[in-house]
Swiss-Prot record:
Name of protein: Pentatricopeptide repeat-containing protein At2g17210
Segments of this protein annotated with the region Type E motif: 620-696
Pfam family, one: PPR
InterPro entries cross-referenced by the UniProt entry: Pentatricopeptide_rpt, PPR_At4g14850-like_plant, TPR-like_helical_dom_sf
GO biological process terms held by the UniProt record: RNA modification
Organism: Arabidopsis thaliana (Mouse-ear cress)
């Protein structure tokens, strides 16, 4: 009798210990306490302890131990208690064994509101939104009510599945849950994803707003491209409502600064976050700061934040890497990647995209192939952004066929990947293939796709295809409303020689910018109408448009092709006076203009006196060499220029061919032989020039020295006739 009393006291002590451990969250002690009871070998009949034990197993994810405890209870009939059955079902649902949880629910003789909430919550918590909402509807049919936690998840499921938010909102009001802060904030989140006006209306109606409410409505405005309103709300939150923001709020505000591209306001928010202690302690704030500074073209400040932060993750690394790429500091981007490797940071798809942009800039084929291997090994082949970036990098590295292989391997060819491939093929001069890809696209083309198509039309210089592309742009309402598309149409017509159609399209663009003006000026220049090009240049300035470096280059090209040396030098002088720093292209254009006019000595003098930060390229020296050939300058000057050209581009065939032609014009046959010998010794790959003519729907090439073309006597007669015409002007005199 004494023994029985002692054992009873011990069981009561263990029971109290289990309950106390659960209050303190010491779940291992709960399970070990229950194990002691089992080792005592006596029947334990306190049904209130079993739910605590199953809760502990769920917290620890101890599925096997929970099953064993359930088996012992099954023998003793404790599962008939609703509270015990609920705890077992909840244990299985939280351990991820949803089937066992549902089976336990089906086996329960009686169920209460908790039973239904356990099932609905478990399904929704594991992402089974549709199944969870189906069980939620059954719960209501049987007359039970959800608890707050379940209702919050139901609202989240409606938000994920884009169900009618107003219906669930109505249910919340009818059920009397609208006064609960967590439920109100969940409804607010649901509206914030799609309707900032409804979110603001609900926010204004809320009697009590906490930091979550403010953060959600601020984020809603930022996502809706209304960052200014979001910033105003942030000021109201801090100064008027006296609500202390948290890291989530600051992250949304920094995103607003990024969208606005207002780095000054961003710095103020950075200072605010420092005073609140958010800048280094929270990884989301740090990453938002890095992104804000990078996109605000202050990557040095972005790197300082990255360097000082104590809580980096892969997003931090990707943000600073993308920042260097965005600011075109590709060498530093590579250094960051090497640092990632040293720190053993695992790369992801975002890292791959940034690295491919670096490869695109350096035009390095081997790194592209290496990254392609990484994409395959890591299983990123389903990532459309990564594959589109790979296609873009391959085409930039002249690996168009490899890019085509990547496109063919994609199960779903989205509009971005197709647009990238079309642009790459156009850049490679393969316009027919580019147009073919456009015709086989399944998605509706966007403005970028149409621009890529128009670029292909520019390359083919086929007027009929350009008109067809123009028609597509009109049907998509892009020809007039989208300035980039309209400008591309102007360029396509100009390249086809249809200058009147180009001008008509230009006049139809409702809101012109400096790019559209530059394109139409260039259009007249390349079509042999320099006077009209320069008249447009003057008209543009009169209308208040400030020419940029490319506009000046178009005007200088017009002077160059028209032989207007004085006008060209005047434009160049005005460019310098207006604080536009001339680039190598501008100097090369002036050199070419002087060389064509026979002022070889002046051109050489200009090259030798270029600014320190501008180094003459092969194109500038090549222009002088071409001038030497046409003007039969002294062999000393020719030899000097040839040496410069071959030093700058020792493996480019055009320099050797031009030098050989120049020496031949001067009848220096020894030098001609030397050029041919150098080509063989240096293994220079000679790329044959070609002309294109459209026959039917195909563009055909005629290569220089093509024996098949020369065997066609009729075609050969036409070519010889054209050759004679090119050597004569209207007065039958030689062209200089």
């Amino acid at each position: 009798m004494v023994m029985g009393s002692h054992l009873c006291s011990k069981l009561q002590a263990l029971s109290s210990k289990i309950k106390q451990a659960s209050v303190s969250g010491k779940w291992r002690e709960v399970v070990s306490g229950y194990s002691e009871i089992q080792r005592a070998g006596v029947q334990f009949n306190d049904p209130f302890v079993f739910p605590i034990v199953f809760k502990a197993c769920a917290k620890l994810s101890w599925l096997f131990q929970g099953r064993c405890i359930q088996a012992s209870l099954l023998k003793r009939g404790f599962e008939s208690f609703v509270s015990v059955g609920n705890s077992i079902a909840d244990f299985y649902m939280k351990c991820g064994d949803l089937c066992s949880g549902l089976r336990e629910f089906d086996c329960m003789n009686s169920r209460d509101s908790v039973s239904w909430n356990v099932i609905v919550f478990g399904l929704l918590d594991y992402g089974f939104e549709e199944e969870g909402l189906w069980w939620f509807s059954k719960l209501r049919v049987w007359g039970f009510e959800p608890n707050t936690s379940t209702l919050v998840l139901v609202i989240h499921a409606c938000r994920s599945l884009w169900f009618d938010g107003e219906k669930i909102h109505g249910y919340v009001i009818r059920s009397g849950f609208c006064g609960i802060s967590s439920v109100q904030n969940s409804i607010l989140c649901m509206y914030a994803d799609s309707d900032s006006l409804s979110a603001r209306k609900l926010f204004d109606e809320m009697s009590e707003r906490d930091v979550i409410s403010w953060s959600v409505v601020i984020r809603s405005y930022v996502q809706s491209k209304e960052p200014v309103v979001g910033l105003k709300l942030f000021k109201e939150m801090v100064h008027e409502a006296k609500t202390e923001p948290d890291c989530v709020t600051v992250t949304s505000v920094l995103k607003a600064c990024t969208v606005m591209e207002d780095i000054d306001v961003g710095r103020s928010v950075h200072g605010f976050s420092i005073r609140r202690g958010f800048d280094l302690a929270d990884v989301f704030v740090c990453n938002s700061l890095i992104d804000m500074y990078s996109k605000g073209f202050d990557v040095d400040s972005a790197f300082r934040v990255f360097d000082e932060t104590t809580c980096r993750n892969i997003v931090s690394w990707n943000s600073i890497l993308a920042g260097f790429v965005h600011n075109q500091r590709y060498d530093e981007a590579l250094e960051m990647f090497h640092l990632m490797v040293q720190e053993a940071v695992e790369v992801d798809e975002v890292t791959v995209v940034s690295l491919l942009r670096v490869c695109k800039f350096f035009e390095q084929p081997l790194p592209c192939k290496s990254i392609h291997g990484v994409i395959i090994r890591r299983g990123y082949e389903s990532n459309e952004v990564a594959l589109s970036s790979l296609i873009d990098a391959y085409t930039s590295c002249s690996l168009v066929d490899d890019a085509g292989t990547v496109l063919d391997s994609m199960t779903y060819k989205d509009v971005v990947s197709c647009s990238t491939m079309i642009s790459g093929l156009a850049h490679a001069g393969r316009s027919d293939e580019a147009i073919s890809i456009f015709c086989h696209m399944r998605d509706t083309p966007n403005a970028i796709t149409v621009i890529s198509l128009l670029n292909a039309c520019s390359v083919s210089a086929d007027l009929r295809t350009s008109k067809w592309a123009h028609g597509i742009a009109i049907r998509r309402s892009l020809a007039i409303n989208d300035i980039s598309v309209g400008t591309s149409i102007v360029d396509a017509y100009a390249k086809c020689g249809a200058i009147e159609m180009a001008r008509r399209t230009f006049d139809q663009i409702t809101e012109k910018n400096i790019i559209s003006w530059t394109v139409i000026i260039s259009a007249y220049a390349i079509n042999g109408l320099p006077d009209k090009a320069l008249a447009l240049f003057d008209e543009m300035k009169q209308k208040g448009y400030t020419p940029n470096a490319v506009t000046y280059l178009a005007a200088l090209s017009a002077c160059n092709h028209g032989g207007l040396v004085k006008k060209g030098l005047m434009i160049f002088k005005s460019m310098v006076e207006e604080d536009h720093k001339p680039s190598l292209q501008h100097y090369s254009c002036i050199v070419d203009m002087l060389s064509r006019a026979g002022e070889i000595d002046t051109a050489v003098e200009l090259i030798k006196n270029l600014p320190e930060d501008v180094k003459a390229g092969a194109s500038a020296w090549g222009a002088i060499l071409s001038g030497c050939r046409n003007r039969f300058k002294k062999l000393i000057i020719t030899s000097e220029v040839v040496a410069e050209v071959l030093e700058l581009e020792p493996l480019c065939s055009s320099g050797y061919l031009l030098a050989s032609s120049t020496f031949a014009a001067e009848k220096s046959w020894e030098d001609v032989a030397m050029m041919r010998r150098l080509v063989k010794e240096r293994k220079v790959r000679v790329v044959a020039g070609y002309s294109m003519v459209r026959e039917g729907n195909l563009a055909k090439r005629f290569l220089a020295g093509d024996k098949l073309s020369q065997s066609d006597s009729e075609l050969n007669d036409v070519v010889q006739s054209l050759h004679r015409c090119m050597k004569l002007d209207d007065t039958a005199g030689p062209i200089n």
